[in-house]
From Swiss-Prot:
Protein name: Protein translocase subunit SecA 1
Family: Belongs to the SecA family.
GO terms of molecular function: ATP binding; metal ion binding; protein-exporting ATPase activity
Function statement: Part of the Sec protein translocase complex. Interacts with the SecYEG preprotein conducting channel. Has a central role in coupling the hydrolysis of ATP to the transfer of proteins into and across the cell membrane, serving as an ATP-driven molecular motor driving the stepwise translocation of polypeptide chains across the membrane.
Lineage of the species this protein comes from: Bacteria, Bacillati, Bacillota, Bacilli, Lactobacillales
InterPro entries for this protein: Helicase_ATP-bd, Helicase_C-like, P-loop_NTPase, SEC_C_motif, SecA, SecA_CS, SecA_DEAD, SecA_motor_DEAD
Chemical reaction(s) catalysed: ATP + H2O + cellular proteinSide 1 = ADP + phosphate + cellular proteinSide 2
Membrane-protein topology: Peripheral membrane protein
Class of this enzyme: translocase
A Gene Ontology cellular-component term: plasma membrane
């Protein structure tokens, strides 16, 4: 371990030497740039653009370009980046992460690589965690870019597609991580090219990169639509049932936070719902509702996992920031189960139309960089997942903060009494205090105790984060006491008021350790910015969540040896601090493994999504007749149908192929079984294709306007692709939920998911081509299709395409008892739901 640590330190030192050398080159231009007039300095931007177009690389332009931004910052903002900030900027340009302490000027540091990369004209995205920071940084730093002749855009959720497109077309675009992700998904759902807003993803610089790429890595961005459902009553009934249970009726696994019915619980469920066997196949849906009701009532906690808004809506609380996540909903029916639990209106379930995780969203950028004050603990994950190094940048001034050893108390009550006593004593001295909590519930509890103790204070949590910046800015004033949920207010500096330095600076008090050391370090880092004095102190108890779930046997043995008879006994020990950090490392390792596994699953979806979206984009951007593509689909559909009967009896095969042709390609009288008898497979395929082509030409001939033909082709393909892709996403979700059980059969769930997912994707492609073929060949193409498509392409789709009645005869005995996903007996090779089952299923 010592050797590994020594190697890491030596590598960091070597990297800093290289950075220092480049930064000195930037310094060497300082006097030259200072001597230039404003006009001459501003003229550097078009000069750099021309040199870049003539073959100079951004690396070659870096020293001079950084020096230009540095001088411009001094003239426009009155701020001049330090030498260490130049080093941080170089790291950002190289697509890595400079670890810069709180207050070291990360926002100003970013101006240099952002300007340099904007010279290429390919676009730079500066990503922040909320719209307040995007607007603030774009407004402040945008003055420098605008002065230097670059355009700056702000991408906000409330903006129209036109305004978003304008923002993305700017040289530099400020946006939140969520909005960039949703815009990407929405761009891949539009029907017309002019409705797309983003350019190709070039360079992203992510502020608070650990929050976005680590803490929220598993969070999927989901675009979904409502599904008409009358199942709300089942949510309510399941909720009423689980509320009748005793603690013996269910089993909770605390470390994994999972829950299930015990044997007595199963008996009660069968009696309550009048069932013979709860786990019969026909009760699968009901067990899903019961499982969600159990989780909602006994795992998900009010004011910790979610809050109830004044509008009677369930809002998710971000476990890492303490903020409510507007617009987000728990998936798979859990959100509805919580709504039933809290007796608020139950909203309809939704169907996923598109989804992506932040991991895969940001890996699509040509170059990705990020800034944070606490990235070193997650270095392995940044390197393995995102191919980004974490390089600690020295502080401009030495850190003066004093970090005290943890204090451990036997109970939560004794711990909180000690916290309140400490806060009150410091308040009376005038020293500002920032109290960090992990949950909204804890911040409210401490607030009540401080009110009782007569200590005035501000509370910053998920319930009032809209004014967090103002509260945080005042947290360093003399006598200020601020309670903040976790890292709420991150991104806003706490500046010390007059006379506070003499009192010891800002004191940060942590009311418990977080699962991640990084989050604890972020809380500590709010104090002692830019060489200011400060203190940090963590208070722990044996009843804390981390201690209960992951406290080591060694900690317990040590505590048993100590006399903890008195409730207010306190233990202060470096060994204890080391043991707690050891527990945190184990949790971090578990969380990393989980995120890595999520990525392995999501990579299957990523590969398939990229294929679908690339093909979709080709269709949208096409300005030519898509006939060759459609003819290819017809040919492959015929091939699949004929090949599906290659081993069947010739007469049976001929009948099945004719049934397929009549249902998907031709009029009933256009093909007979006798015509196919005696023909080889290749000849049958050729015959069907020739006749199908004739029908295709007749259909297209109804559209005399070439533009109308292209519009019709596009809408047809996109409509089918989008419907099938939405179904496929749901199917993959179901597969992912079920494939874990295969581990019990000694099969690797991820390998099973990959192979099964690939097979399902192949089936989906076949279904897309079959649906396009059948709709194209059987559609009634109306007169209005000769007109140019209307402004709303989706409306046009409804006008242009109305499938003819396709003879299905589902009442025929041969179709009785066929399941949705079984092969259709007609011989098409398609699933029943996509063929003769389509009508009855609808």
């Amino acid at each position: 371990m010592a050797n590994i640590l020594r190697t890491v330190i030596e590598n960091d030192k070597g990297e800093l030497k290289k950075l220092d050398k480049i930064a000195k080159k930037v310094d060497s231009y300082a006097d030259h740039m200072a001597a230039l007039s404003d006009e001459a300095l501003q003229a550097k931007t078009p000069e750099f653009k021309e040199r870049y177009q003539n073959g100079e690389t951004l690396d070659q332009l870096l020293p001079e370009a950084f020096a230009v931004v540095r001088e411009a910052s001094k003239r426009v903002l009155g701020l001049y980046p330090y030498h260490v900030q130049i080093m941080g900027g170089i790291v950002l340009h190289h697509g890595d992460i400079p670890e810069m302490r709180t207050g070291e000027g990360k926002t100003l540091t970013a101006t240099m690589p952002v300007y340099l990369n904007a010279i290429s004209g390919l676009g730079v995205h500066v990503i922040t965690v909320n719209e307040y920071l995007s607007t603030r940084d774009a407004t402040e730093m945008g003055e420098v870019y605008s002065w230097l002749g670059l355009s700056v855009g702000i991408n906000l959720a409330a903006k129209s597609p036109f305004e978003k497109r304008e923002a993305y077309n700017c040289d530099i675009t400020y946006s939140t991580n969520a909005e960039v992700g949703f815009d990407y998904l929405r761009d891949n759902m539009v029907v017309r090219q002019e409705d797309m807003v983003q350019r190709p993803l070039n360079y992203a610089l992510v502020d608070e990169v650990d929050s976005v790429l680590i803490d929220e890595a598993r969070t999927p961005l989901i675009v979904s639509g409502p599904v008409s459902s009358e199942m709300n009553q089942l949510y309510t009934r399941a909720d009423m049932f689980v509320k009748t249970l005793n603690s013996d009726d269910y089993i909770i696994d605390v470390p994994t936070k999972t829950i299930g019915l015990s044997d007595t619980g199963i008996d009660k469920a069968e009696n309550y719902f009048h069932l013979n066997n709860l786990y019969d196949l026909e009760n699968v849906a009901l067990t899903h509702y019961i499982d969600n009701a159990l989780r909602a009532n006994y795992i998900m906690l009010l004011n910790i996992d979610y809050v109830v808004s004044e509008e009677q809506e369930i809002l998710i609380v971000d476990q890492f920031t303490g903020r409510t996540m507007e617009g987000r909903r728990f998936s798979d029916g859990l959100h509805q189960a919580i709504e039933a639990k809290e007796s608020v209106p139950i909203q309809e379930e939704s169907k996923t139309s598109a989804s992506i995780t932040y991991q895969n969203m940001f890996r699509m950028y040509h170059k990705l960089a990020g800034m944070t004050g606490t990235g070193k603990t997650e270095e392995e994950e940044f390197r393995e997942i995102y191919n980004m190094r974490v390089i600690p940048i020295p502080t401009n001034r030495p850190v003066q903060r004093i970090d005290h050893s943890d204090l451990l108390y036997p109970t939560l009550d004794s711990k909180f009494r000690a916290v309140v006593a400490d806060v009150k004593e410091r308040y009376e001295q005038g020293q500002p205090v920032l109290v960090g909590t992990v949950a909204v519930e804890t911040s409210d509890l401490i607030s009540r105790k401080l009110v009782a103790a007569g200590v005035p204070h501000e509370v910053l949590n998920a319930k009032n984060h809209f004014k967090e910046a103002q509260i945080i800015m005042n947290a360093g004033q003399r006598g200020a006491v601020t309670i903040a949920t976790n890292m709420a207010g991150r991104g806003t500096d706490i500046k010390l008021g007059e006379g506070v330095r003499e009192l010891g600076g800002l004191c940060v008090i942590g009311t418990e350790r977080h699962e991640s050391r990084r989050i604890d370090n972020q809380l500590r880092g709010r104090s002692g910015r830019q060489g200011d004095p400060g203190e940090s102190q963590f208070y722990l108890s044996l009843e804390d969540d981390l201690m209960r779930r992951f406290g080591t046997d060694r900690i317990k043995v040590v505590l048993e040896r100590m006399n903890l008879a008195e409730d207010d006994t306190v233990i202060k020990s470096k060994m204890l601090t080391r043991q707690v950090e050891s527990a945190q490392r184990r949790v971090e390792g578990n969380n990393y493994d989980t995120r890595k596994q999520v990525l392995q699953y999501d990579d299957v979806m990523r590969e398939q999504r990229e294929i679908i979206y690339a093909n979709r984009r080709e269709v949208i951007t096409a300005e030519r007749d898509l006939g060759p593509e459609l003819k290819g689909m017809i040919k492959r559909t015929i091939k699949r149908a004929v090949d599906a009967h290659s081993r069947s009896d010739k007469n049976t095969a001929a009948e099945a192929i004719v049934n397929f042709a009549r249902s998907a390609l031709l009029d009933e009288e256009a093909i007979t079984v006798s015509e196919l008898r005696g023909l080889k497979e290749a000849e049958i395929k050729e015959l069907l294709y020739e006749r199908a082509l004739a029908v295709y030409e007749q259909q297209i001939a109804k559209l005399k306007d070439p533009e109308a033909i292209i519009e019709f082709q596009k809408v047809l393909i996109l409509m089918v692709v989008d419907n099938q892709w939405t179904e496929h996403i749901d199917a993959l979700d179901q597969l992912r939920n079920s494939v874990g059980l295969r581990g019990y059969a000694q099969n690797n769930p991820i390998v099973e998911y990959q192979s099964e997912g690939f097979r399902m994707f192949q089936d989906m492609i076949g279904s897309i081509e079959f649906d396009v073929t059948r709709t194209l060949m059987k559609a009634q193409i109306h007169e209005q299709e000769r007109e140019r498509a209307s402004q709303h392409a989706t409306t046009t789709a409804e006008q242009n395409i109305s499938a003819q009645h396709v003879p299905m005869n589902n009442e025929s005995p041969e179709y009785q008892g066929i399941k949705r996903n079984d092969k259709c007996p007609c011989g098409s090779g398609m699933k029943f739901k996509n063929c003769h089952g389509l009508r009855c299923l609808q």
